[in-house]
Swiss-Prot record:
Name of the gene encoding the protein in the UniProt record: ylxH
Protein task: Involved in the placement and assembly of flagella. Activates the SRP-GTPase activity of FlhF.
Binding of ATP, residues: 39-46
Cross-referenced CDD domains: FlhG-like
Molecular function per GO: ATP binding; ATP hydrolysis activity
One Gene Ontology biological process: bacterial-type flagellum organization
PANTHER family: CELLULOSE BIOSYNTHESIS PROTEIN BCSQ-RELATED (PTHR43384:SF4), SEPTUM SITE-DETERMINING PROTEIN MIND HOMOLOG, CHLOROPLASTIC-RELATED (PTHR43384)
Protein name according to UniProt: Flagellum site-determining protein YlxH
One cellular-component annotation, GO: cytoplasmic side of plasma membrane
Subunit structure as annotated in this protein's UniProt entry: Interacts (via N-terminal region) with GTP-bound FlhF homodimer (via NG domain).
UniProt-listed SUPFAM superfamilies: P-loop containing nucleoside triphosphate hydrolases (SSF52540)
Protein's UniProt keywords contain Cell inner membrane: no
Family in the record: Belongs to the ParA family.
């Protein structure tokens, strides 16, 4: 049956309204984005993300750390702070992101994941769009934005992970951690097979142990998934890390020359040393990619 002009106009309006609901305002993106993930909890993901952010901040960069482990965030605990606003306030109460940031050591800006239930499942499309708009604004204000994702991969975390320029997978030399990291990569490539994925191996006795663990993981990924991952580096198994956690002081602050601190400094340099050129060559910005996911959800 042929649509009359009235029906066509109504259909067009509906499509435009839907598009307006899901497309955020796009600011000029300045920041480079990194999503940090792990296959399971307990591998030191949040600790590495925090201290790597501090290493970048120490080099004079403007860094924003976003704790997207909603309701289970560790950044406040690791810093020894109690934030007045969390990501939950931004997501549920439409509080502006930049006004909700806390200030950590070395002037690091961050937003806590908060505590309580995961609220992302309760977000409607308008709240998603509001949050994306806030992120777009933040990306124009910082040099680097690091997303500390929750352990495992939930449906609501995927858009943020897949939209980032780089994905850093944290694992340890333990066989179970290696297998969990493989499962995380498999889940990602089944959704999107053109991703920039790098691996950092935590709690290594020496560089060789980190390289050996990466080699096992990389071989398995290549054999069964036919994709490549890159070695970002390893982080030394250092007693200063557990002491810093107990004292609620980032180990990069507590002991800047400790083995673990030197490791995250090298890791940060390795991750971002060549990103300037590649960042300019990217066809889509973080927000453009995220918007496409929002359109699919609508």
């Amino acid at each position: 049956m042929q649509m009359n002009r009235y029906d066509q106009a109504a259909t067009l309006r509906a499509k435009m309204e839907k598009r307006e609901r899901v497309l955020p305002m796009v600011y000029s993106q300045k920041a480079k984005t990194l999503a940090v993930i792990s296959g399971k909890g307990g591998v030191g993901k949040s600790n590495i993300t925090l201290n790597m952010a501090l290493a970048l901040q120490d080099k004079g960069k403007k860094v924003l750390l976003i704790d997207l482990d909603i309701g289970m965030g560790n950044i406040d605990i690791l810093i020894g702070n109690s934030s007045s606003a969390t990501i939950i306030d931004v997501l549920t109460d439409r509080k502006p992101l930049l006004q909700s940031l806390s200030v950590g050591p070395k002037g690091l800006r961050y937003i806590s994941g908060g505590t309580g239930l995961d609220v992302m499942f309760q977000l409607d499309q308008r709240k998603w769009t509001f949050f994306a708009n806030e992120l777009s604004h933040a990306l124009s204000q910082f040099d680097y934005v690091l997303f500390d994702m929750g352990a495992g991969l939930s449906k609501d975390q995927l858009p943020f992970i897949l939209s980032a320029e780089d994905i850093l997978i944290i694992t340890t030399p333990e066989p179970t951690a290696i297998m969990d990291a493989y499962s995380a990569v498999k889940h990602l490539v089944l959704t999107e097979n053109k991703l920039s994925m790098k691996v950092a191996v935590n709690r290594c006795r020496d560089q060789k142990e980190g390289l050996d663990a990466f080699a096992r993981l990389s071989r398995t990924i290549h054999m069964f998934l036919d994709v490549q991952v890159q070695f970002a580096g390893s982080v030394s198994d250092d007693v200063i890390v557990s002491k810093a956690v107990v004292e609620q002081v980032p180990f990069f602050i507590k002991s800047p020359q400790a083995k673990a601190s030197r490791s995250v400094r090298i890791l940060a340099d390795a991750l971002f040393e060549r990103e300037e050129t590649r960042h300019k060559e990217d066809k889509q910005t973080f927000i453009e990619k995220l918007s496409s996911f929002l359109m699919r959800r609508a």
